[in-house]
Amino acid sequence: MYWCYHCYAVNPRSTGPCVRCRGPVDGPPGLSYDDRLIWALGHPDGDRAVMAAQTLGARGVRSALPALRRAVEEDRDPYLAVAALRGAIAIAGPDELHDWLEQLAHSESFMVREVAQRAIA
């Protein structure tokens, strides 16, 4: 089973055209491990996306900050939003993210709200 780099569809082969979008299944050549983790933030399998957010935070990947912020703000999965927020805090620290955390401290998501409030306390 192989995931399409462009649309995340499951494909029977690691190369060639995607069964859904017809784009190439494989990603661009030379992607770094960090780039693949950033890609995985959009993965439809929530566990993979959460693991990617946690790993990006643990690795301190600053280039992932915009993607992590999007994952929080899109709020398509509350567990991903929390993992992405924690990852962003681990990378940049609460001082650098203070204004954003202040906004998130009033989020509709109680999970995001709690993490943001703890970070600025």
Residue spans for each PLM region:
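Amphipathic alpha-helical scaffolding segments comprising HEAT/armadillo-like alpha-solenoid repeats
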Residues: 1, 28-40, 61-74, 93-106
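Short cysteine-rich clusters marking metal-coordination/redox-active sites
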Residues: 4-7, 18-21
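Short, flexible, mixed-charge glycine/proline-rich loop motifs
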Residues: 1, 8-13
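Short inter-helical turns and helix N-cap capping residues of alpha-solenoid HEAT/ARM repeat scaffolds
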Residues: 44-45, 76-77, 108-109
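Alpha-helical segment of the N-proximal tetratricopeptide repeat
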Residues: 36-61
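Alpha-solenoid repeat junctions
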Residues: 25-29, 56, 60, 88-93, ...
